[in-house]
Structure formats: C-alpha cells, structure tokens
C-alpha cells in the first residue's frame, strides 16, 4: 500500500480475547512524501525515499497480513486497518501491595511525593484484605438472625495491616507521641500533602495514591507522580473488575464529592505506539510518563471511559450513578481527584483523534502492570 506521509505515527492495539488488532498510521504534521508500508507477521516495514524503518513486534505477538480488512482513511487521524492477531495471555493481576510486602516482613511507609518516612520499621504479622465497603449491609440481608457485627468496625491490631480497595488501615498507637482524634487528616511533615486520615484514636487510613510501602531493607523508589497515580488507579480497577465483576466506578474525594465517573471497557489490550522517523524509532508522548523501557516495547493496557464531574458537569448522571448499587465508589484525597483528572485529560489528548471519545465519554488508556 502507499500513502502520503512525512512522519508517521504508528498505533497498534492487539485484543487478546478477540484475537484482533487495530493498526493506525497517522497523518503528518506538515508536508509529505511517499511511504510504502508492508505488514509481516512479526513486523511493520515502512520505506520512503529517505530510508527504511522497521518496527518489530514484541515476542509472542503475530499478525495475519492476509486478514487485512476494514481499511479506511479518517481525516485528521490517518489510515485505519484491522487484522487478525495472536498474543500470549497476560499473567493474572497480583495485588500491588502484596508484590512488595508479605506478612512477617519489616517495612516502612513513605510519602510518595517527597519520600518522608511516615511509619518506620513496622513488622507486620498479618496483611489481610478487607471485605467490600457494603459488607455489613450484605450480612443484614443474608442472615436470619441479628447481625453479630453490628456497630463493630474492623480495626487492625498493632502488627496488622488491612488492605481496602484504595487504602491501607494500620494501627498507629505505637508511632504517635500523643493520642490523635478520630476523623482528622494525616499530613506529611515535610511536603504537607494529605496522606490519609485517622479512623479512630488507634487506627489510621493511608490512601494508596499517597504512600509507598517498602521492605525496610529496600530504598525509596523515585517514581514520577503522574505515573504512580495512574498505575495505582489502573491496578485497583483491574483487581476490582476481576474479583467483583464491577465495571463502573466513581472517584470521590474524602468529603464525599464525586469528581470523575469511570467505565472500564477492557483490560486485555496490548498496545504498541512508537513514532517512526526516517530510519529511527522513538517514544510517543503516551508512553513518556508510563514506561522506562525501550521505544519498541509493548505494554498491557486498561481502557477506561471517563466523565469529569467538576463545576456541576454531568450532575444528573453522577447522581444516578451514586444511587446505582452496581457502581463502586473509590475514595481519594480531593486534591488527588483533581490531579487524576488532569492526568486523564493529558492521556486522552495523546491518543489518536478517533479513539479519544465514545458517545459523550472520553477515553483513558493506561499502562497496567500485572
């Protein structure tokens, strides 16, 4: 095939379950030249008068060139075509908390923004997942006798850590000089960022987007803030979709205000997006904050539709979602909710134009570690 391009943006998405691939060859910013494109089972080859560029597919991914179909040109976006594809299955998601922390380990809690130690050298004898936020109501529905857990909240003991959907609960009695009051904010001493809040005089809730938990012998990992927030939220969504078959979520602040509506489309995508230019391959902005690997790498992705709910936008839709028991709320600090909205907007702007919206929703395509 031949198209007129000056600098071609290549976007490839492989759906593992559907065994299909979408290939988008973008339009040049300005000018143009003849470009011949060949699709082989393991690579994309682009030839121009100035040279030849080959983009190799990652191991385990194969295309079927003879299955090319749905060829169309979309103005402002480029050439689209669909093919049959095969990709190895991705590993099952593992709790990101348990990847780096196991019971019996001595660990420390750090402020993710500045690296300040919040809890130092805490030996955790039990690391336990919490039930869903509505577990008490479910007990009342299913039990034929009075609820034995009524008015008995779950509080961790001194060497416990309870893991919720978007937070950790730890016993803070031994780390504080004076007994704290319930329902007060926990602020980082160095950068003054809100890390969590006290649930009771002995229990502190730390939000997963604000702290990093590391074994004490390890060092503080310096991860860019936007990359960290994206990965935490993406991991939470994948785990909840897998465990509870829940696909719609609200992102709300600790004050109960809804900031974002999320609707998970799929988490089985493999995305590859280099930018080719006269014999070289380099990263495209969608990957710059997400990966440290080379530009030829592919990444597991979760695709999520979202709607902002700030400044009274989508007020009726947000209200209807809040009243729907199939919609799961995720609570974060209000400042992080606004930060996440900016991250989603920037991510959306880096996608091919035709993929940025679906009906009235916008698309977020995030790197998802497994």
Curated annotation (Swiss-Prot):
Main location: cytoplasm
Region described as HECT-like: 332-368
EC number: 2.3.2.26
A Pfam entry, by short name: HECT_2
Reaction(s) catalysed by this chain's protein: S-ubiquitinyl-[E2 ubiquitin-conjugating enzyme]-L-cysteine + [acceptor protein]-L-lysine = [E2 ubiquitin-conjugating enzyme]-L-cysteine + N(6)-ubiquitinyl-[acceptor protein]-L-lysine
Keywords: Acetylation, Cytoplasm, Metal-binding, Transferase, Ubl conjugation, Ubl conjugation pathway, Zinc
The protein's enzyme class: transferase
A GO CC term assigned to this protein in UniProt: cytosol
GO BP of this protein: proteasome-mediated ubiquitin-dependent protein catabolic process; protein autoubiquitination; protein monoubiquitination; protein polyubiquitination
Family matches, as InterPro entries: UBQ-conj_enz_E2-bd_prot (IPR019193)
Binding-site positions, Zn(2+): 144
GO molecular function terms attached to this record: cyclin binding; ubiquitin conjugating enzyme binding; ubiquitin protein ligase activity; ubiquitin-like protein conjugating enzyme binding
Subunit: Interacts with UBE2C/UbcH10 (E2 ubiquitin-conjugating enzyme). In vitro, interacts with cyclin-B.
Summary of the function given for this chain in its UniProt record: E3 ubiquitin-protein ligase which accepts ubiquitin from specific E2 ubiquitin-conjugating enzymes, and transfers it to substrates, generally promoting their degradation by the proteasome. Independently of its E3 ubiquitin-protein ligase activity, acts as an inhibitor of CPSF3 endonuclease activity by blocking CPSF3 active site.
Entry protein name: E3 ubiquitin-protein ligase E3D
């Amino acid at each position: 095939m031949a198209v007129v391009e000056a600098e071609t943006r290549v976007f490839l998405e492989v759906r593992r379950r559907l065994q299909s691939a979408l290939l988008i060859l973008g339009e040049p910013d300005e000018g143009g030249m003849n470009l011949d494109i060949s699709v082989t089972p393991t690579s994309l080859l682009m030839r121009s008068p100035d040279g030849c560029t080959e983009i190799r597919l990652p191991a385990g991914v194969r295309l079927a060139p003879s299955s090319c179909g749905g060829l169309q040109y979309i103005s402002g976006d480029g050439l689209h075509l669909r093919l049959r594809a095969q990709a190895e299955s991705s590993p099952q998601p593992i709790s990101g908390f348990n990847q780096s922390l196991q019971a019996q380990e001595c660990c420390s809690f750090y402020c993710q923004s500045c690296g300040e130690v919040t809890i130092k050298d805490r030996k955790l004898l039990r690391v336990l997942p919490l039930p869903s936020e509505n577990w008490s109501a479910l007990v009342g529905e299913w039990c034929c006798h009075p609820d034995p857990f009524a008015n008995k909240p779950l509080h961790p003991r001194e060497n416990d850590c309870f893991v919720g959907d978007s937070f950790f609960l730890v016993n803070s009695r031994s780390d504080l000089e004076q007994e704290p009051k319930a329902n007060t904010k926990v602020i980082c001493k160095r950068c003054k960022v809100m890390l969590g809040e006290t649930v009771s005089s002995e229990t502190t809730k730390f939000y997963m987007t604000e702290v990093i938990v590391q074994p004490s012998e390890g060092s503080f990992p310096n991860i860019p803030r936007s990359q960290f927030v994206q990965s935490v939220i993406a991991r939470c969504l994948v785990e909840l979709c897998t465990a509870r078959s829940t696909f719609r979520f609200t992102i709300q602040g600790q004050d109960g205000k809804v900031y974002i509506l999320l609707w998970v489309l799929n988490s089985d995508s493999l995305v590859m997006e280099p930018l080719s230019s006269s014999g070289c391959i380099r990263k495209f902005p969608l990957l710059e904050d997400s990966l440290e690997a080379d530009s030829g790498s592919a990444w597991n992705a979760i695709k999520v539709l979202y709607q902002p709910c700030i400044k009274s936008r989508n007020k009726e839709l947000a209200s209807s979602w809040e009243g729907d028991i199939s919609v799961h709320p995720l609570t974060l600090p209000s400042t992080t909710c606004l930060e996440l909205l900016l991250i989603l907007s920037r991510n959306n702007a880096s996608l091919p134009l035709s993929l940025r919206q679906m009906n009235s929703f916008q698309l977020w395509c995030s790197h998802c570690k497994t």
